[in-house]
Amino acid sequence: PSDEYINYKLERVKGGTGLLIVSMSALERSRFVQPTCFPKENVPALKVLCDKVHAEGGRIFGELWYWWGAAGPWGPLSPPAPSMGASQTQFNLFGNRTTTREMTKDEIRLMQATFRQAAENLRDAGFDGIMLHGSHGAVPEQFLSPYFNRRTDEYGGSLDNRLRFTLETLGALREVADGKMAVGFRMNCDELVEGGYHTKDAWQILKKIADSGLIDFADLDVAIEPDQYHIGMPPVFVDPHSYRPYVEAVRSAAGDLPVLSVLGRLTSIADGEAALQSGVCDMVGAARALIAEPELVKNAKEGNEDRNRTCIACNWCMASLYFDGAQNCTINPASWREGHWGVETFTPATNKAKLIVIGGGPAGLEAARVGALRGHDVTLYEARDHLGGALTLWSRLPSRAFYNKSIEWWERELKRLGVAIRLGHRVTSDEILAARPDAVMVATGAVYSAEGRSNHRDAELAGHDSPLVHMPEDILLGGARPKGKVIIIDGDGLHTGTGIAELLAAEGAQVEVISPMLAPLSLRVTATQDTPYILKRIKQLGVKISPTSYIRGIGEREVVVYDVHTEEEHTIRDVDAVVLATGRLSVNQLERELEGKVAQLFTVGDAASARMWATASYEGHKFARYVGEPERPSTIGEAYFTPMTAEP
């Protein structure tokens, strides 16, 4: 494990988490960048992790898995080796198309020997327990499930045959543990697919495994991947604890064995306590909740649960692995950067500064928080009468009000830290200079292009000044509600266009979404697991979706549409309104007016360049740490053209 990995885990243990279960590839050949416990050479590094966790009073289990999508290359710079499975099964996740190889009996034995060796390595490194991962389409589930398993030998067919691989593998792990380590099994309560197993089947599976005496605890999950990936990591559209009915239906099969479950989207310690009190499980697991707030447990124990950041289920922690190459969190930029930005790193700045932050979106809010934590005198100006910036826009879309939880947390923290907040005041450069600040953070965000410019066509749209046109801000902040036939031009493929479509269609409008993409949602939304929910909702309301299309221009109650591939055109007539949810452009005039007049001037987040929320909060955090540090760059331009270091 890297230093970043170890620091991330330690921050959670210090924050009160009692047990870490770390997911680890049981095979060396894996395409994922995560610890693998198979080569013996990895034992010393794993021991460092265990020793540090134990020194903080924590316990640590290793979750052994092999997943259909994890197959790595044959060697450096080589094509991928086949994914091993129970049978030939075709998968597709984010364009990663795979057909698993049906393992021979010799290959089954080799895989089981690999799991055994991995368990021995965990034992030698000092792990307290081992869990075999049999959910999410992992190999044990491929044998257990009739959806995957089409074998005709002793590993397929009847339930006892389909259980054989799992029981044999658990038997090997039990021998390795030798009573000195806990052994557990993670399994699905319901695969939620036709042809898969469901709660009654899962009850029988768990009963047989529990009766075998091979495990000390069960971890109950729901859904498989990739078919139900959006259920396996439920986004904001899904209520907290969505797994609970499935776990309740299966848990009695465990008998006296303790049951662990993530329950599907933990939002607070109070919710977890309620689940424990009801008896649905004996241990509550959390992943995203701890990414967002490492001190989740500690704060609750100390009576400070209101200081906890609440995971808003935006799922950028998952999507960022694909787009940023790192696991980033919208409301906790320190996640995976704990060695530099963790809880214990907020030492006083070299020089205490008077810091003015302009803009109350994610970048400005995080900049003000970090500035205050480092001892600066911070004032935040926001032109609107509320905080939130771009987060406010999306939180006003249907079923996304939970995003407000992040804004509420930032506001509470700024008040606790003594930040002066000036709402409803569009501060001028003259006012800023008159205040004689040492540093200014321009976090004034971005707005949707009134000219209809987008990343599909960066040019003015003919007719953009038509009286038919509405901007997203008019609808979400100004209360405009166009009626009749409404055309939405969705040029960015995020939540805004389709969210407004749902909002207006629910109020009776006839809505058509025109998008240059294959679907009206980008890969970023697909990766956050929102797409299935969004498309289902707008289709139920009768919204028409016109993919791979864009418009030439807006006329008198008509728009000219063309296919982005074939250039074929057609005209939509009798249009009552057009919404331009195209591209966003930075609002940063204050940067130009203040340039060269302030000792430190940082333009951050969407004001620097319109991007995702997590990038905005990251930049607010990063450059707030530069304030009052004479050896640091004094603008983002200086920082950009300075050679990178190991720091975030």
Please describe what each predicted stretch is.
Residues 233-239, 344-347, 352-353, 393-405, ...:
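Short, contiguous acidic/charged loop-to-helix segments that flank catalytic cores in large enzymes
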